[in-house]
Amino acid sequence: MVGASGGAAVQRGDVYLVTLHPARGREIRKTRPCVVVSPDELNAALGTYIVAPLTTGSHPYAFRVACRFQGQDGHVVLDQLRTVDRARLAKRLGALSDVTQRKVLTVLQAMFAP
């Protein structure tokens, strides 16, 4: 699938290296892997994406999903969701496993539609 900009379409579950700075206060900062959590229909239409950072230095909290990506254990930090422009997506790194993607969607549903 090809996106509007001519590159590969950004899809839910894809992991990109994303530039998150500037950040304020306790927001996760710097350039780090993030998983796209917005639906494909939104991704194709808007050119902005809802992402959740991945981190290896996290504690297990209710809104963080344990994951393994590129050989490293970590967490999807769903309490730090951000909407970012395509320009912040530096490089596609891969995608989360289907099992982890389902867990992410389950936690998001619990967060927003309890």
Go through each PLM region and give its residues.
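Conserved functional hotspots at enzyme active or ligand-binding sites that engage polyanionic ligands
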Residues: 1-114
